[in-house]
């Protein structure tokens, strides 16, 4: 079975890729992350993924457009609920790419993160699958999060400290420094 995996970063993708391959799936990676800012962060994550994909011979599709403006336009009216728009942007595009590329299903490395809104992502992915007529391969990879992070550190992967969006980065600094806006 051919599966297109949306990949947010190499640290989150390494365990899901191995698990799906061990299950006999033919995995292709898909990089599309208009939420990641600034451009230096975007490039660091993309470049790390490209090097890892080459190392493990993972076919990788890059939709390599730095998406600051489209992302901000999509979330600006309701910043408090930005995550749903972010998931929609990435998972609908992954479903579209999977359908057009002849894949049997799609999934995302996001499903390994204990920091993401897991059930919301699942609902968005199911809607995207229905809209594009492609299967959604659901796996809860969260039990492998720590193992994947350890693997990433051992292999010298770039390790980010926030989900990627500027609002998440702001929250990280406000919480860390206890700054009152």
Annotate each PLM feature.
Residues 1-181:
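Nucleotide-activated chemistry modules centered on ATP-dependent adenylation/adenylyltransferase
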């Amino acid at each position: 079975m051919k599966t297109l995996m949306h990949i947010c970063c190499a640290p989150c993708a390494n365990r899901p890729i191995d698990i799906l391959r061990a299950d006999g799936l033919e995995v292709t990676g898909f990089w599309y992350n208009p939420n990641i800012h600034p451009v230096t962060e975007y490039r660091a994550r993309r470049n790390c993924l490209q090097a890892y994909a080459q190392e493990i011979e993972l076919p990788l599709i890059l939709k390599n457009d730095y998406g600051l403006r489209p992302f901000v336009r999509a979330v600006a009216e309701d910043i408090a609920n930005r995550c749903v728009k972010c998931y929609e942007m990435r998972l609908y595009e992954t479903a579209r790419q999977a359908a057009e590329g002849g894949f049997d299903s799609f999934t995302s490395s996001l499903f390994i993160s204990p920091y993401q809104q897991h059930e919301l992502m699942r609902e968005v992915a199911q809607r995207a699958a229905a809209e594009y007529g492609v299967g959604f391969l659901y796996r809860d990879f969260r039990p492998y999060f720590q193992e994947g992070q350890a693997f990433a550190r051992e292999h010298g992967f770039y390790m980010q400290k926030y989900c990627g969006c500027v609002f998440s980065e702001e929250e990280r600094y406000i919480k860390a420094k206890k700054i009152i806006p």
